[in-house]
Amino acid sequence: MKKRDIPPVVMMLSPMSAAMRQFVALIAAPIIITACKSATNPPDSPPGDTTVSITGRRMFPADNPWNKDISSEPVDPASDVLINTCGASAPLHPDFGTTWEGGPIGIPFVVVRGDQPRVPVTFDYDDESDPGPYPIPPGAPIEGGASSNGDRHVLVVDADNWKLYELFDAHPVSSGASWTAGSGAIFDLSSNSLRPAGWTSADAAGLPILPGLVRYDEVVEQKVIAHALRFTCPTTRRAYVAPARHFASSRTDAAQPPMGMRVRLKASVDLSSYPANVQVILRALKTYGMFLADNGSSFFLSGTHDMRWNDEELGAMKRLHGRDFEVVRMGTIVTQ
């Protein structure tokens, strides 16, 4: 779901289709180890399918849109219409966790050191992709697993140079000696720079993916999420609003939400009955909200795969619905 237009249909994605895995320890070489090793690793998971903490390091500067407190920002005049289009009665769905139907759920990422060897990457959309080589380690986890026919994202963080490398529809060639991908983007995590106007990334909206994921290390270890999150809607407009840089639709109806639309959980929602870990996520949704980043199922919230997640606990979020959210007032909507 990238550069090409999305036809006017409601796309119902299974929980497996939107996201996959996590972070790997900062050590001299990138290795993929599992946080909860067991004899029952999911199919297609890389050797040692990992989870780790990123030790609280914040992505992007404090004044970056991802890190902005929007709890007091005005509500957009079109909020009700836009929420209805996305699905006012749809439950908030955690599109991450442990496994579903035998496969891992959540978007994976891996951490490497600055001396990680770079490998060449060939892109389908090379005119809107940042050229390689990329520091992709052997055995880097792919969203959905090696045989996935989904979005197949690969996310790599160079922790020494504080850069993020992301691929969409990524396929290793010759055991990872090189890769092919639909598109790719490199983000300087110490900068506020955006993609060029009109450019995609590894995400439909031209946004980075990793900064918008719910991560186990934040929720359970740090007990705070200090940034916006990422979600999807079934249909979108041929338009985007900053910090998004790209649209992925042919629809021009103003009732359709533009990419980059930011929503927040209403301040009136009582969080006291939710599990403590879920409250961490919901407080972030009140304070920082979440960006519309791709076409997908209604109010699917993205996060990392981690075998330590409690899926039943995360499921408590489904008690919330689209109508519990409101659109934060948008700036200039770009349609060309």
Predicted regions and their residues:
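C-terminal motif of bacterial Sec signal peptides marking the signal peptidase cleavage site
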Residues: 34-35
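Sec-dependent N-terminal signal peptides
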Residues: 25-30
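Short, conserved catalytic or interaction motifs in soluble domains
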Residues: 38
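Short, surface-exposed polybasic-aromatic patches that bind anionic ligands, especially phosphate groups
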Residues: 45-336
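Bacterial N-terminal signal peptides that target proteins for export
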Residues: 2-24
